[in-house]
Regions:
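CoA-thioester-processing core
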Residues: 89, 93, 103-104, 109-163, ...
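C-terminal long alpha-helix characteristic of the crotonase
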Residues: 124-129, 180-228, 235-236, 241, ...
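Glycine- (often His-adjacent) and acidic-residue-rich active-site loop
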Residues: 54-92, 108, 222
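Acidic, divalent-metal-coordinating active-site segment for phosphoryl/phosphodiester hydrolysis
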Residues: 110, 166-173
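Conserved CoA-thioester-binding segment of acyl-CoA-metabolizing enzymes
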Residues: 1-53, 91
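Terminal low-complexity tails and localization/encapsulation signals of metabolic enzymes
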Residues: 1-2, 248-261
Length: 261
């Protein structure tokens, strides 16, 4: 049986791929592996961006493997512990200080949307994507942060529309409501995600982390608290070798070459 969890690094960009065709259901141990590996990935100074995708071009993920949930709950000791682990993994992605990019193609349902919601960039295929949180049709609710993160990304009205009606949207509608930052042809999707990761990898590391910390953090803070975070970010990055290089490059009308400080 093929390993449903694939990991690789190319040009400072780490890629996690679900590999369980055709629907790429996320097995219980996929999350176990992410929880084990993400701390090392996020602390590695040579990894400057992360891409979450899936093998092939059929589907990103149709969600969690529901048949494995009872086994996962038994191993975790309780439903609360089982889902707490999943929230820990998404919190690491969202708050880890490394830009995370997700790809939407084919089915992106349930956990196949909730994991990307913890990422900082989402790119969709221009054809064939079916994105949604269908838990209402199962008599349940999103269990992996979907009802908390989706309204922060697209607003309350669109989130209620998608969740209460279990409505699936395509890539173009996802772009219109702000769920994704861009839409590209399916055959270009993975290359575009890699290219974006490589572009982000050239940016000054401390400044990237400071911006992520400030913008992600502002969603749960007051304006005054967020401004204080920004002040601290400015103080931490101003005067670093990379900021000096950026200023010099601007004045000399050339492209900066950062040393990743």
């Amino acid at each position: 049986m093929a390993d449903p969890y694939l990991y690789s690094v190319t040009n400072n960009v780490a890629t996690f791929s679900v590999n369980d065709a055709p629907y790429n259901l996320m097995p219980v141990h996929y999350i176990d592996r992410l929880e084990e590996q993400l701390p090392d990935v996020l602390s590695d100074p040579n990894i400057r961006a992360i891409v979450f995708t899936a093998e092939g071009l059929a589907n990103f993920s149709a969600g969690m493997n529901l048949r494995q949930i009872p086994e996962g709950i038994k191993r975790a000791g309780s439903p609360e512990a089982f889902f707490a682990q999943r929230h820990r993994v998404l919190d690491m992605i969202e708050n880890g200080g490394t830009p995370a990019i997700a790809t939407f193609f084919g089915y992106c349902l349930g956990a196949g949307l909730e994991l990307p919601l913890a990422c900082h960039f989402r790119i969709a295929a221009s054809e064939g994507a079916k994105i949604g949180l269908p838990e209402m049709d199962l008599g349940s609710v999103p269990a992996w942060g979907g009802s908390a993160r989706l309204p922060r990304v697209v607003g309350r009205s669109y989130a209620l529309d998608m969740i209460l009606r279990a409505r699936k949207i395509d890539g173009n509608e996802a772009l219109r409501i702000g769920l994704v930052t861009e839409v590209v042809p399916l055959e270009q999707l993975k290359a575009r995600a890699q290219a974006l990761g490589e572009e982000l990898a050239t940016q000054p590391r401390l400044a990237v982390k400071a911006v992520l910390d400030t913008i992600v953090g502002c969603e749960t803070k007051t304006m005054d608290e967020s401004i204080e975070d920004e002040k601290r970010a400015v103080a931490a990055t101003l005067g670093t070798p990379d900021s000096q290089e950026g200023m010099a490059a601007f004045l000399e009308k050339r492209k900066p070459v950062f040393n990743q400080s």
